[in-house]
Structure formats: structure tokens, C-alpha cells
Amino acid sequence: MRALIFGRFQPFHKGHLSIVKWAFERGYSELVFLVGMASENYTPRNPFTAGERIEMIRLSFLDAGLPLEKAITATIRTLETSIGSVYYVLSYVPRVDTILTRNPVIAKIFLDAGVNVERPPLFNRDEWRGEKIRMWIARGDDRWRSTVTPSTARFIEEIGGVERIRWSLASD
């Protein structure tokens, strides 16, 4: 079985990685990561490019000892939320059996389009949340490092992600 995980992944963090592990435990053999809002980057809400987010997914898989061949990545531009978007999304990814989402609007439009939806559990949502991680990075709070895998933290630093987030929030 193949599942779709649709997200912004700003950044890809341990909450996302926990959903990956949960999905494999549930019997999904492959996961398709659709990196949303691919056309927006260098903003406070979306500081990383689509390519950088794909790299974070790959690094997180490697750090966790998960097989890369079980991950398929795709990107999609920023879309309005509508039932028509479901068909557009599905045309950008390989066939999937299910979408894994906690977003009730996304779940509803995919259900209405006839796609199976499964709601993953929350994993340490108090800390593993993109908005909070970006806030910690902006404030110079090193707690952000514990929310992503070691290779992802190094990657964020190597690409100037810390400075980028601080700059984007200062200019907002």
C-alpha cells in the first residue's frame, strides 16, 4: 500500500518522522511526500525552498535508518483548497491508496473525491511544530536542534537557514 503525506515541511521535523514510522508500522510499504507551497520560499512561514525540504526528508530518512527507496517525493505549487485541487494533486504523484492528514479541510475534500483518508496521531505537538521550531530558530534558542534529526540541523545551518529565518522575520 502507498500513502500520500501532503505538507509544507518547514522544516521536516521529528513529528513528520514519527508519522513516517507510524505509517510503516500500519503496513504502508511506500510513502509519497508532496511538498506543498513549492512556489513560495524565503518568507517567514515558508523559509525553505522545495528542493531544500526534499533534502531534509532524505536526510531524516537516512538518520533514522529508513530505506530511501520507500520514499517518493514530488512538489506542487501553491494551490487554493478545493475539490478540483484534489484531482490536480493526484495528477502530480504516483497512484496512492490513502492520504495521511490531520487537516480536516484537506481530509474532507479528498474524501469527497473518493480518496481514502487516515488521520495519524499527534506526536509531541507542543514542540514538534514548524511554527514553534522557526520561532526558536529566529530567537537563537537551541531547542530547535532537538526537533529535527542531526543531519537536518546541520543542513539548515549549511544553507544559511538560521540567518534566512531571522532575516525573513525581521523584514516582515
Swiss-Prot record:
GO MF terms, alphabetically ordered: nicotinamide-nucleotide adenylyltransferase activity
Matching SUPFAM superfamilies: Nucleotidylyl transferase (SSF52374)
A GO BP entry: NAD biosynthetic process
Lineage: superkingdom: Archaea
Keyword Membrane listed: no
Sorted UniProt keywords: Nucleotidyltransferase, Transferase
CC per GO annotation: cytoplasm
Family per record: Belongs to the archaeal NMN adenylyltransferase family.
Name this polypeptide is given: Uncharacterized protein APE_1986.1
Source organism: Aeropyrum pernix (strain ATCC 700893 / DSM 11879 / JCM 9820 / NBRC 100138 / K1)
